[in-house]
Amino acid sequence: MAAPLIWINAFPGTGKLTIAKAIKSIGASVTIIDNHQLIDPVALRFSRDDPCYQIERKRERERAFKRHVQDPSTASETIVFTDFQTDNELGRSVAYEYQTAAIKAGRPFIPIYLECDLEVNIERATSQERVFGTTTKLTDPILLRDFRSKCRLFEFEGLSLGICIDTTNKDPSDIAKIILRYSQEVYKRE
């Protein structure tokens, strides 16, 4: 059986990429696809309100699935995607793309949901590293507060897989160990 696809879904600034990097530092063979690797090339060409934006985002995901998830030469690598999908029509549709890609490739699909205290989330999202970074990461505390008050994070319902982890007071390496342990348990059951 192929190695799992771990899909980390959380609000911006929760620690997705930091935790994915911690997973890679512990795991033997891990490939990380940060959502900004899929967002930023599209954002260079289209504004988020352009009708072509979501079409191009889907194409970027499909290319990533083909290259990293479905290519037989990557079957032994655990693939970790970071994402932010809310519980609306678009968010559900995008989330199911990840699950479908894993199924097509014969990989266990492991959704991970991260949460953290609002004030900690804002502190992380407005860190110097993010504010002066080279990606389109959200750094606006007002917008983040608005997202968190109006949006619900998408979670697969009825799926026996998946865990939710509060990252507020946990070290990223400890969270990575929880995720890897859980993914190994799922892998053994499959």
Task: List PLM regions with ranges.
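Hydrophobic anchor at the beta1->P-loop junction of P-loop NTPases
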Residues: 8
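The conserved Walker
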Residues: 12
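Conserved glycine(s) of the Walker
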Residues: 15
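Conserved substrate/cofactor phosphate-moiety recognition/catalytic segment
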Residues: 18-69
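Glycine-rich phosphate-binding loop used to anchor ATP phosphates in small-molecule kinases
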Residues: 56-113
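Short, amphipathic alpha-helical "lid/cap" segments that border enzyme active or binding sites
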Residues: 61, 65, 172-183
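Conserved phosphate-donor/acceptor-positioning beta-strand/loop module used by diverse small-molecule
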Residues: 103-125, 165
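Small-molecule kinase domains that catalyze NTP-dependent phosphoryl transfer to phosphate-bearing small molecules
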Residues: 123, 127-178, 189-190
